[in-house]
Amino acid sequence: MTMLKDPSKKYRAFPTIDLPDRTWPSKTITEAPIWCSSDLRDGNQSLIEPMDSEKKLRFWKTLVQVGVKEIEASFPSASQTDFDFVRTLIQDGHIPDDTTIQVLTQAREDLIARTFESLRGAKKAIVHLYNATSPSFRRIVFNQDKQGVKDIAVNAAKLFVKYAAQQPETHWTFQYSPETFSATEMEFAKEVCDAVIEVWNPTPEHKIILNLPATVEVSTPNIYADQIEWFCRNVSRRDSVIISLHCHNDRGTGIAATELGLMAGADRAEGCLFGNGERTGNVDLVTLALNLYTQGIDPQLDFSDIDGVRKVVEECNQLPVHPRHPYVGDLVHTAFSGSHQDAIRKGFAKQQEGERWEVPYLPIDPADIGRSYEAVIRVNSQSGKGGITYLLEQEYGISLPRRMQIEFSQVVQGETDRLGLEMTAQQIYSLLHKEYLQANAPYALVSHRLQEENGHSAVEVEVAGEGETTLHWRGKGNGALEALVAGLPIAVEIMDYNEHAIGAGTNAKAAAYIELRVAGGRPVHGVGIDENITTASFKALFSALNRSLSQQEAKAA
């Protein structure tokens, strides 16, 4: 089957909203919305392999550290795992006083009862009710008319009141989502929400949340903004309602839809870090927050260590962040074009500490989010002839990890600037050897012994230290590398590890690459090459460790 010559026979444009006096186009966002992360619920349910409890707790702690104050933790009635996770958060004291747990439930009494039971003992909680309201869901999925769909919402809302009253020690906030809101007739969406409001009887002092999802993105962002402005004008008791947005990215405009929705009067935004979620993902909270930041608005979220946050998200979701992803991708602060590089160089030369940021091609100062300037201008001395990475792969079988490519290209650029000449493949390899493989001070690996004990690795290494001293370090861990890190006298965090074979047969060698941080410093890479893969990995660690310590010493001097 191929694309239709006349797609109007199969698809139709979404109807516009009659709102000739719309005001949102002339407004600007002046403050951060209330943020709600749905990573542990909407994000988790979209993963090929959902997170286990350990990963969920790690993710929860990261969200708290970043500063997210409302976190949708799970769907407690969906599984015992989700129920138990909520209990763990409450019973083990993982919910700070300024943070509110949110959970989701469908509109059935047994599920609602189970949901409230999961929250027993919580100081405060948001309980989130939803049912779909759009024509296609009414007709195709539920076989219900409008009254039937409205009754589902109203009856469930009454059950919320009933079960909340049984746990008066908790400060409850109720949230209702007319799922598929953006594909629902506005008058009917308002009718259902007004009916729920009537049951919950909110006040300006104790508000409810009405969450208005673009469950599937069906129109351009301006139409969604019109829907939000129309709804904000017409919903009952607006002063007692928090209007929340929940955008997906099916048309690639989830960020724009959310920003226009905030301009149209919304108070709150739900989403996921780096845009994980069903299909094309939920709106990306990181991009939303940093878009505000680069407009001079405090986003109320802290991404000072954006690479550390990305590491947690990638490991928990088991999904990579795209190298072109806004703000956090490996390549977003990198210029390959000569004219771009020239403009950036001139911008850095004129930029003064404390002045407004005006470096061309860089909408944010990379240092603000924990990035170094070294990756900004990546010079390829063999531009048009394959590049540094291509030459190393083709001539020497060395495949540098992406972030190390960025780091090493700066070393090459420094050498080409010094020589005033292009570098051959042999010269590039010699520079790699000198920079990484000969990084033997202050600690040089002499030998190592590895043993397996009760499923764990035990490592003892002999190290040549400064002043001809001999050191012996011992450590245990789940693998050889983890055991070595445990035995180091310095706090080291491994950010990334890669390995591959060089050549084949009896002459094959192993190459190992490590990215690590020493004592919370900036990430540094190391390389090790040896016939034995364990030895290669140890050499790579010492290479990175020595390079980091040398750089810290040089900076201190």
UniProtKB/Swiss-Prot annotation:
The keyword Transferase is annotated on this UniProt entry: yes
EC identifiers of the protein: 2.3.3.13
CDD domains: DRE_TIM_LeuA
Keywords linked to the UniProt accession: Amino-acid biosynthesis, Branched-chain amino acid biosynthesis, Cytoplasm, Leucine biosynthesis, Magnesium, Metal-binding, Transferase
Span of domain Pyruvate carboxyltransferase: 33-307
Record field: catalytic activity: 3-methyl-2-oxobutanoate + acetyl-CoA + H2O = (2S)-2-isopropylmalate + CoA + H(+)
Major site of localization recorded for this protein: cytoplasm
Chain positions covered by the region annotation Regulatory domain: 439-557
GO CC annotation: cytoplasm
UniProt-annotated location(s): Cytoplasm
Job description of the protein: Catalyzes the condensation of the acetyl group of acetyl-CoA with 3-methyl-2-oxobutanoate (2-ketoisovalerate) to form 3-carboxy-3-hydroxy-4-methylpentanoate (2-isopropylmalate).
Oligomeric and partner information: Homodimer.
HAMAP family reported in the protein's UniProt record: LeuA_type2
NCBIfam families: leuA_yeast, PRK03739.1
Protein name in the entry: 2-isopropylmalate synthase
UniProt lineage: Bacteria, Pseudomonadati, Pseudomonadota, Gammaproteobacteria, Pseudomonadales
Gene for this chain: leuA
